[in-house]
Amino acid sequence: MFKINSPLKVIVGFNKKKQKNVEFLLNLNNFRNTFYRVLNNAKVQYKIDIQGQLEGVEKLKRCVMIYTVFKGDNRRFDIGNIASIHQKFFEDAFVEYGYLPDDKYTNIPMVLYRFGGISKDNPRVEIEVFNLDDEYEVKRFKDLTKDTIDTFYKERKRKK
């Protein structure tokens, strides 16, 4: 298992008039409404941003991934709105760098999105990758997902 810290936004250009960087927020709303060239710049920059974190990672044949969103503020949001774009960009980069043969369902049969909390100092999406060909990692994944579900139900009962 390894973990990647993915930024919630990437720099896609520079505004000369305002003398500041142009940022692209990695979420589905922006993805849907943005010009394709800007999207391509965002995807390229994302790959560059995570490349250093992938050094030393073993090549995999099959894996499962957990995307945990840590927001920088208390505003409510849709987890899938943020995590889906991180999933798209990360899995494409993971395949392009040669760590996985393909990102189809036979190589990544399960993906889990979850909320990690508020992190004002370090908003991010943590991506955990578990090798399905390693029994120890499969057990860790099972334990982690069981703990996540147990925590959800305990909180739900407490609120009733």
Where do the model's predicted regions map?
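Catalytic phosphate/metal-binding cores of nucleic-acid and nucleotide-processing enzymes, i.e., regions
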Residues: 1-160
